[in-house]
């Protein structure tokens, strides 16, 4: 199956914003006075100012969210599973003054919530959704996920801070979730364990029952595969046990992002055998 990753927002220079500007928060000169992003979080102390135009949800609703219907219907023709990035933004979205240098001085506004997910469900038919629900915990988001039976996400690199109730720890998972070692915005697993000091990794050492960095990655695989989660996804960089030089993206930076490529032969029969073995042990083979 192919999972298509759908960003919630459009680029300012996209065909959609140019051709259907009535659906976006633009002034009479077609400029953004406020833009999209997220407040400070685990990824960035300054937050993330993405700079995308915000949706004019009132206008979209008056048109029965037809633009979103067309978007999701087309995505369902291309992909088997659709991952909606920043799903929280459907419930409430963060607005940042366009002239601010970072995302610290923004505010939240309410989004369409169930009105939009009803349209999405009609548009995609029998295709499946993964909701990227990371970030600030919002009760309304959890309610919307349950109502639509959308699986949310768990990230193992977020698991070892806090206490034993951390929702990203495998023993706290519910079945209807998708587990990642890290997202495209995270360090690689090997990079995470190498770069972070012992005082940050104390609970990880205990939970994974080892201090050996390479074995810690193996133990993360086992913890995820052995959990009740319906689906487990690891980046190929983690299967190859590469350091942070191979990470996909560092948020709020420019330069080396999205440039890593896997070389021919780098993923070999030994890697495939190991992952197939884990799938067999924990009953995750393809049926």
Name each model feature, range by range.
Residues 1-10:
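Conserved, well-ordered alpha-helix/loop/beta-strand core segments that scaffold catalytic motifs
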Residues 9-233, 237-244, 250-265:
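Alpha-amylase-like alpha-glycosidases and glucanotransferases acting on alpha-linked glucans and related
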Residues 260, 277, 281-287:
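Domain-scale activation on soluble regions of proteins
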Residues 270-278:
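Membrane-proximal transmembrane or re-entrant/amphipathic helices at the cytosolic face
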């Amino acid at each position: 199956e192919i999972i298509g990753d759908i960003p919630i927002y459009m680029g300012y220079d996209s065909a959609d914003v140019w051709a259907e500007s009535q659906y976006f928060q633009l002034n009479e000169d077609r400029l953004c006075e406020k833009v999209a992003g997220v407040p400070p979080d685990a990824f960035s102390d300054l937050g993330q100012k993405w700079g995308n135009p915000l949706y004019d949800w009132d206008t979209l609703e008056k048109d029965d969210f037809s633009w979103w219907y067309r978007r999701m219907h087309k995505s369902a023709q291309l992909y088997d599973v659709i991952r909606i990035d920043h799903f929280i933004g459907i419930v409430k979205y963060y607005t940042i003054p366009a002239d601010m240098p970072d995302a610290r001085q923004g505010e939240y506004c309410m989004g369409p919530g169930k009105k939009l997910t009803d349209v999405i469900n009609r548009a995609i038919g029998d295709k499946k959704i993964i909701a990227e629900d990371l970030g600030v915990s919002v009760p309304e988001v959890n309610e919307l996920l349950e109502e639509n039976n959308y699986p949310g996400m768990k990230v193992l690199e977020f698991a070892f801070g806090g206490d034993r109730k951390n929702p990203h720890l495998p023993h706290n998972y519910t079945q209807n979730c998708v587990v990642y070692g890290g997202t495209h915005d995270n360090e690689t697993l090997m990079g995470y364990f190498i770069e972070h000091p012992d005082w940050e990794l104390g609970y990880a050492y205990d939970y994974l029952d080892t201090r050996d960095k390479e074995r810690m990655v193996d133990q993360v695989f086992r913890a995820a595969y052995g959990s009740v989660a319906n689906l487990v996804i690891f980046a190929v960089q983690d299967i190859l046990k590469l350091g942070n030089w191979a990470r996909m993206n560092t948020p709020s930076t420019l330069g080396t992002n999205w440039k890593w490529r896997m070389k021919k032969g780098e993923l070999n029969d030994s890697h495939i055998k190991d992952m197939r073995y884990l799938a067999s042990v924990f009953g995750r083979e393809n049926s």
